[in-house]
Amino acid sequence: MNQKLPKILIITRGVWDDSKGTSSTLSNIFCNYNPEQLSCIYIETKKPNTKICNTFFQISEISLIKKIFKWNTKTGQEINSEYIENDSLAKMEASTMNYVRHNRSFFYTFLREVLWAFNGWKSKELKAFVKKVNPDIIWADGSPLILMNRLSKYITKLTRKPYCVYEMDDVYTYKISNYNPFRYIYKYFLRKNVSQLITNSSQLFVISPKMKTEYDKIFNVNSKILTKGIDYSDKEFKPYKVVEPIKMVYMGQIIYDRLSVLQELGKIIDDINVVGKKIQLDIYTTNHIDEEIKSSITRKGNVKFNEPVPYDMVTKVIDEHDVVVYAESLNKQYEYVARLSFSTKITDYLASGKCVLAIGPKNIAPMEYLKNEDAAIVANSYDELRRFLVGDNLPVLIEEYSMKGFYCGLKNHNKKDIDKMVAETMRTIVSI
């Protein structure tokens, strides 16, 4: 632990839970901190599960609804190790949010923003918490929600302390997959909040080189690229011989039409395996899949759906395979979903020493990065994917890119270098 680092108050949407990959980025960035130097504000009614940070303030959106009808309802509270989670409230909120995410209607986003517009979250408890933790720096996670940007702006004004912003998705440009006039209106107001937050920040962190290029120009800043870092101190590249059947694995969500990519990959594998079992694809996902669709993908026995494994078992599963698949939809309807983003899984895949097979449109940040770094087998179309997989030199390609990917990770995502950059940036901000 480094006692000389400044105290940081982190503002993020979801609960900090180290058992889930979604929280791995925060834990990765701040794991060298003394937990007493960190505090966190979040808006999910769940108990944190992390050893990285001990001090939390939770804003309950269900309580915000109740406050409309009963104004003295408490909407936020400090969370510590003795806190007992309100199961009924947590389940109610989780059920509500799962429904909203499943339906993906802009109407629910609008209702959520209206709820926050009542400002019931600006509680005396929140003000007391911020005063108590007295941070040196505010760390604001970027968000595609106006409400989260409003929360971050409010806290920065409350503390009058310097702050940095970490953008992981394109929250600013008008490049939206589905045309909807209401979404454009929403984006207009989101842009105003994002612009104010970034323009007044001491440092902007971004997730990908493509985002840096665009946002530096838009906001006239010199942003710093920050990805999940990998500890290479005990890692060394171990070459492996590829033998048939080649074992491929996909691990992750299949939302945003990623399932269609896996379906096409499965069809190509089925065609190849007509003359004998040459490739096997394993899929691990937490998402529900219609049984009819699942049956159509697996009917020839070349693709298998597996029960999801805990986050700490992911490395073991990858080690058992030759190729790890990273997929984004090739459907133009979804072309902007990952346009500037960079999945935390990519750094894990590169560090695994296994070949990465990346499938997706050529103009999005992950594909551009892997192509420019020559760190993966990159297929920007199904025809290109088929050419790679039917080629006689596929085993040689896999062995070659397993090494290239590993050393790309060592060069660009070494945790030692990233930790040093973040720590130096934090110290510089405080000294300004």
Indicate where each model-derived feature is located:
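N-terminal subdomain of nucleotide-sugar transferases
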Residues: 1-83, 223, 231, 270-273
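Membrane-proximal helix-turn-helix segments that form the acceptor-binding/catalytic region
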Residues: 124-128, 150-158, 171, 184-204
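Nucleotide-sugar-dependent
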Residues: 257-260, 314, 324-347, 356-368
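Conserved donor-binding/catalytic core segment of Leloir-type glycosyltransferases
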Residues: 241-262, 266-269
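Nucleotide-activated donor-binding/catalytic signature segment of Leloir-type glycosyltransferases, i.e.
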Residues: 285, 291-320
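A short, active-site helix/loop in glycosyltransferases that binds the activated sugar's phosphate group
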Residues: 44-45, 194-223, 422
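Carbohydrate-associated surface elements
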Residues: 210, 228-229
